[in-house]
């Protein structure tokens, strides 16, 4: 079984329009575009649209994985806590006969929208093609294997699989992560500074003379 794909927060943030809206919460990434299409024009979409491309884990109780609740000061009843305003599949504050509750699972419990996992930590690396001397800086997920990083790099070099990946002259195990290959984390002190590039691992690609280039 193929494992779930990892995404960086930056990748999630690119999906921030009404026609392409992703959010992340509790470590997973969701594509809510079909939800917006199904409820197009509904005012209850507003809080979701406002958070397009962002992490909304603070909406949830990490233990129950449900929306946070609170005691309504007026009724004394336990209700969902939605400080940004009520949104799709949240029941109205008072009983109403016109509220349709036949939607099945609420969207935040519906696995249909799940597209992958949110990386707990991202890393910057430099990939140097020794054949062409081209260098590409990539933000990758620390949980990804080198094979999965290779798939990211295919955007820049469609023949990336025709190269041997090395660090300091040592062949890398493509089935393992950067850390599992003994590549240490870059110094946190330099992250976000002009010197960050100096501390990003440089992976060198050496061309294999094979038939995949034909």
Curated annotation (Swiss-Prot):
GO molecular function, a single term: metal ion binding
Phenotype seen when the gene is deleted: Mutants are able to survive to adulthood. Embryos constantly develop three otoliths in the otic vesicle at 24 hours post-fertilization (hpf) and recover to two during later development. Mutants show impaired coordinated ciliary beating in the otic vesicle and olfactory epithelium.
Annotated localization: Cytoplasm, Cytoskeleton, Cilium axoneme
Domain Cytochrome b5 heme-binding: from-to ranges: 4-70
Example GO BP: regulation of cilium beat frequency
Keywords: Cell projection, Cytoplasm, Cytoskeleton, Heme, Iron, Metal-binding
Binding site for heme: 39, 70
Tissue expression: Selectively expressed in motile cilia-rich organs, including Kupffer's vesicle, otic vesicle, floor plate, pronephric duct and olfactory placode.
GO cellular component: cell projection; cytoplasm; cytoskeleton
Pfam families, sorted: Cyt-b5
PANTHER family for this protein: CYTOCHROME B5 DOMAIN-CONTAINING PROTEIN 1
Function: Radial spoke stalk protein that binds heme under oxidizing conditions. Required for the coordinated beating of multiple cilia maybe by functioning in a redox signaling pathway.
Family from the record: Belongs to the cytochrome b5 family.
Protein name from the UniProt record: Cytochrome b5 domain-containing protein 1
Organism of origin: Danio rerio
Recorded name of the encoding gene: cyb5d1
